[in-house]
UniProtKB/Swiss-Prot annotation:
Fe(3+) 1 binds at residues 79, 111, 211, 272. The keyword Transmembrane helix does not apply. GO terms for molecular function: iron ion binding; serine-type endopeptidase activity. Pfam families: Transferrin. Its main location: secreted. This is Lactotransferrin. It comes from Camelus dromedarius. The lineage of its organism: Eukaryota, Metazoa, Chordata, Craniata, Vertebrata. It is found in: Secreted; Cytoplasmic granule. Fe(3+) 2 binds at residues 414, 452, 545, 614. Monomer. Found in a complex with LTF, CLU, EPPIN and SEMG1. Interacts with E.coli outer membrane protein C (OmpC). Found in a complex with MPO and LTF; interacts directly with CP, allows Fe(3+) incorporation into LTF and activation of CP ferroxidase activity. Residues 44-51 are annotated as: Interaction with E.coli ompC. GO terms for biological process: antibacterial humoral response; antifungal humoral response; bone morphogenesis; innate immune response in mucosa; iron ion transport; negative regulation of apoptotic process; negative regulation of lipopolysaccharide-mediated signaling pathway; negative regulation of osteoclast development. PANTHER family: LACTOTRANSFERRIN, TRANSFERRIN. The active site is at 92, 278 (nucleophile).
Length: 708
C-alpha cells in the first residue's frame, strides 16, 4: 500500500496532540474470537508503544452501541444498518472512520448489496416467494434492510406494529436470519447451522452468520438465494470457474454474472464504519490508535498480527477482512449524511406503516433557513393543507445537508449554493423567473430563464471609489458562497490580485458565514438585539441582497455586492421599512469593470457578470413529484394565483426574499438543463471551481468524501 496509505495516515496524524499516557480506547467485542483478537491487538500496541486499547466484552453489536452511549466502551465497527440505529436517540453515536475497500488504485468507501443464486435455478428477483433464503443478519444492510426494502411490495405486510419478521417468515418457505428470535420466528432460523444456543446466534458462533456465512448457506444447498455484498463470492471462491456457478439477480428481473455487480445490484451501500459518541467521544484518540495500528499492522505489513485479517476458520473479526484500511470521516458527517437518503428511506420504509410511507411520499418537506423563513413556511404549510411541511436549519448548507439525508426535500438556492448542492448529488428542479418588461405571465413557466446581473453599488457622494480602487475599502456582501455577493466579485478580485487574502485586501466587511472573529464579519450587526452577528440567515440584518444594500445605505460599508434590481427594489418608496423609506435611486451608482461609474439604471452596460437565477434543488428521485406539487402550489399562491393575495403569497415576504426572491414572477421549467453543470453553465462552474482554491466549505469536503 505504498501509494495509498502513507498519504492517508499523514492526513489523520495532523493536529493530534493528545498524550497517550493514562488514556485508553475501550474497543467493544461481540464473540470469544473477537475478544481473542482484541487482546492480541492490545498486547501488540503495547509493544510498539502506541495508544492503549482495552477490550470490552458484549454479546452483540447492539449491546456495544448501548455500552458506548453510556460511556462503558468507546468504539466498535458497525454495518450501515446499525450505524443508522446508533445515530438515533438516545444513543447519538456518529461514524468517525470508514473502512476502505476495492484496490489500491481504486479505493472505495462503499459496496454493493447483491442477491446471489446458483446458476441454472432459473427464478428471478420477483419470483422469490416460497423459496429458501440466506441472510447476513437481522437489521444488516446487504442481508436484510436493502433486500427487504426492495421486496416490500411483494410482502403481505401493512407495516408496524406487525413485525416485519412475521411477514418475511410467511414469504420464504425457510430462512437463516441470524440475530432473529428463533423461538418467536422458528421459520427464520430453520436453515441456520449453529448448535444449541448458537443456532441463529448474532455472531460467528452461528456458521451462517455474516457475509461468508450467508454465502456458505447458499453453497451448502440450504438456501436458494443469498443476500450478501459484491465481494463475498470473490472472497469465498478465488477461482473463476467456481464463481461461474453463481449468478446475480437484478432488480429488472434478469440475471448477470457475479462480476457484473456494478450494473446488477440491489443498492450501493456505505462501508462499515467505526462509531463513537458524538460528545466526549475520544474521537482524536481513537483515530490516533487506528493510525498507529494501520501503520504497524495494516494491509501488507510483515507483522504476525493483521488488523484486517482473521485466523483460519474465522471471518471479519473487529474489522472486515476485505478492508484495505480506514479513512477518517469529517466531523460534518453524521450518521444521516454517511448513509444517505436512499438507504435511510429503505430503513424507514421497513419501520413505518403503509399509511406513513404513503404520507411521506405524498408530502413535500421544504427546508427553511432561519426563524423568519420558518414562519413563512409554516404559513405556507397551513394554507396548502399540509401538502408542504417544513424543516428548519440555521444555515443554507445545513438545509442542503437535510435534503441529502432525506429529512427535507427541497429549497430554492442561489447559484453558488446550487454548485455546492450539485457537487453533493442534488439536481435543479425549477428556476425562479424574474419579471421583466417583456415578461408575459401566461408563458412564464415555459419561458427560458434569463439570469440576472451581479453589480457593485456605491453611494454617489463617495465619488472617489472605482473598481480599481477598492483596496482598503469596507465591503457589504450577501453571504459567503453566494453568487452576486461573493463568488463573482471575489473571483474577479482574486484573479486581479492573485491572492486569496480578501481580509487583507478589504479593510473590513460584512460577509455572513465568515469566521465571526475575522475582519470579514467586522461590519455585521446581527439582529436588533445584537445577537446572531454574521450568521448566514435573516437573523443578521445585513444578510442577503437587501441586507447587503442596507449595510451600504446606512454608511457602514463603502461598496455593496448585490444584483441589478436590489437598489431599484429598495429606493424611491419601494421599501417602506424605516431604514429604506427615504432612500433615493439617484443617490447610488454602479462600479464598472473598466474603472468608470454609471447610474443604477444602466446595469446592462455596467455589471460584473451575468449570474444564473436561483433555482429549487432536490434529490433526483423527488424531481417529478416535486415539480408537480410546486406547479400546483404556484397556481394557488403564485403571483397570479387564485389565492394570492387573499390567503398567502409565495413570492412576498414580511422581511425581504424569504424562501424565494420577492421579484420572482414564477417557478419556470428548466428547458432540459437538468444537472447543476447544465443549469449554471460551464463558465460559471469553472469560475466557482477556481474560487474554491480560496475557501473551503465543510459540506463540500464532506460530500467529496461521500462521493469518492
Amino acid at each position: 500500500m505504498k501509494l495509498f496509505f502513507p498519504a492517508l495516515l499523514s492526513l489523520g496524524a495532523l493536529g493530534l496532540c493528545l498524550a497517550a499516557s493514562k488514556k485508553s480506547v475501550r474497543w467493544c467485542t461481540t464473540s470469544p474470537a473477537e475478544s481473542s483478537k482484541c487482546a492480541q491487538w492490545q498486547r501488540r500496541m503495547k509493544k510498539v508503544r502506541g495508544p492503549s486499547v482495552t477490550c470490552v466484552k458484549k454479546t452483540s453489536r447492539f449491546e456495544c452501541i448501548q455500552a458506548i452511549s453510556t460511556e462503558k466502551a468507546d468504539a466498535v465497527t458497525l454495518d450501515g444498518g446499525l450505524v443508522y440505529d446508533a445515530g438515533l436517540d438516545p444513543y447519538k453515536l456518529r461514524p468517525i472512520a470508514a473502512e476502505v475497500y476495492g484496490t489500491e488504485n481504486n479505493p472505495q468507501t462503499h459496496y454493493y448489496a447483491v442477491a446471489i443464486a446458483k446458476k441454472g435455478t432459473n427464478f428471478q428477483l420477483n419470483q422469490l416467494q416460497g423459496l429458501k433464503s440466506c441472510h447476513t443478519g437481522l437489521g444488516r444492510s446487504a442481508g436484510w434492510n436493502i433486500p427487504m426494502g426492495l421486496l416490500r411490495p411483494f410482502l403481505d405486510w401493512t407495516g408496524p406494529p406487525e413485525p416485519l419478521q412475521k411477514a418475511v417468515a410467511k414469504f420464504f418457505s425457510a430462512s437463516c436470519v441470524p440475530c432473529v428470535d428463533g423461538k418467536e420466528y422458528p421459520n427464520l432460523c430453520q436453515l441456520c447451522a449453529g448448535t444449541g444456543e448458537n443456532k441463529c446466534a448474532c455472531s460467528s458462533q452461528e456458521p451462517y452468520f455474516g457475509y461468508s456465512g450467508a454465502f456458505k448457506c447458499l453453497q451448502d444447498g440450504a438456501g436458494d438465494v443469498a443476500f450478501v455484498k459484491d465481494s463475498t463470492v470473490f472472497e469465498s471462491l478465488p477461482a473463476k470457474a467456481d464463481r461461474d456457478q453463481y449468478e446475480l439477480l437484478c432488480p429488472n428481473n434478469t440475471r448477470k454474472p457475479v462480476d457484473a455487480f456494478q450494473e446488477c445490484h440491489l443498492a450501493r451501500v456505505p462501508s462499515h464504519a467505526v462509531v463513537a459518541r458524538s460528545v466526549n467521544g475520544k474521537e482524536d484518540l481513537i483515530w490516533k490508535l487506528l493510525v498507529k495500528a494501520q501503520e504497524k499492522f495494516g494491509r501488507g505489513k510483515p507483522s504476525g498480527f493483521q488488523l484486517f485479517g482473521s485466523p483460519a476458520g474465522q471471518k471479519d473479526l473487529l474489522f472486515k477482512d476485505s478492508a484495505l484500511g480506514l479513512l477518517r470521516i469529517s466531523s460534518k458527517i453524521d450518521s444521516g449524511l454517511y448513509l444517505g437518503s436512499n438507504y435511510i428511506t429503505a430503513i424507514r420504509g421497513l419501520r413505518e406503516t403503509a399509511a406513513e410511507v404513503e404520507l411521506r411520499r405524498a408530502q413535500v418537506v421544504w427546508c427553511a433557513v432561519g426563524s423568519d423563513e420558518q414562519l413563512k413556511c409554516q404559513e405556507w404549510s397551513r394554507q396548502s393543507n399540509q401538502s408542504v411541511v417544513c424543516a428548519t436549519a440555521s444555515t443554507t448548507e445545513d438545509c442542503i445537508a437535510l435534503v441529502l439525508k432525506g429529512e427535507a426535500d427541497a429549497l430554492s438556492l442561489d447559484g453558488g449554493y446550487i454548485y455546492i448542492a450539485g457537487k453533493c448529488g442534488l439536481v435543479p428542479v425549477l428556476a425562479e423567473s424574474q419579471q421583466s418588461p417583456e415578461s408575459s405571465g401566461l408563458d412564464c413557466v415555459h419561458r427560458p430563464v434569463k439570469g440576472y446581473l451581479a453589480v457593485a453599488v456605491v453611494r454617489k457622494a463617495n465619488d472617489k471609489i472605482t473598481w480599481n480602487s477598492l483596496r482598503g475599502k469596507k465591503s457589504c456582501h450577501t453571504a459567503v458562497d453566494r453568487t452576486a455577493g461573493w463568488n463573482i466579485p471575489m473571483g474577479l478580485l482574486s484573479k486581479n490580485t492573485d491572492s486569496c487574502r480578501f481580509d487583507e485586501f478589504l479593510s473590513q466587511s460584512c460577509a455572513p458565514g465568515s469566521d465571526p472573529r475575522s475582519k470579514l464579519c467586522a461590519l455585521c450587526a446581527g439582529n436588533e438585539e445584537g445577537q446572531n452577528k454574521c450568521v448566514p440567515n435573516s437573523s443578521e440584518r445585513y444578510y442577503g441582497y437587501t441586507g447587503a444594500f442596507r449595510c451600504l445605505a446606512e454608511n457602514v460599508g463603502d461598496v455593496a455586492f448585490v444584483k441589478d434590481v436590489t437598489v431599484l427594489d429598495n429606493t424611491d418608496g419601494k421599501n417602506t421599512e424605516q431604514w429604506a423609506k427615504d432612500l433615493k435611486l439617484g443617490d447610488f451608482e454602479l462600479l464598472c469593470l473598466n474603472g468608470t461609474r454609471k447610474p443604477v439604471t444602466e446595469a446592462e452596460s455596467c455589471h460584473l457578470a451575468v449570474a444564473p437565477n436561483h433555482a429549487v434543488v432536490s434529490r433526483i428521485d423527488k424531481v417529478a413529484h416535486l415539480e408537480q406539487v410546486l406547479l400546483r402550489q404556484q397556481a394557488h399562491f403564485g403571483r397570479n394565483g387564485r389565492d394570492c393575495p387573499g390567503k398567502f403569497c409565495l413570492f412576498q415576504s414580511k422581511t425581504k426574499n424569504l424562501l424565494f426572491n420577492d421579484n420572482t414572477e414564477c417557478l419556470a421549467k428548466l428547458q432540459g438543463k437538468t444537472t447543476y453543470e447544465e443549469y449554471l453553465g460551464p463558465q460559471y462552474v469553472t469560475a466557482i471551481a477556481k474560487l474554491r482554491r480560496c475557501s473551503t466549505s465543510p459540506l463540500l469536503e464532506a460530500c467529496a468524501f461521500l462521493m469518492r
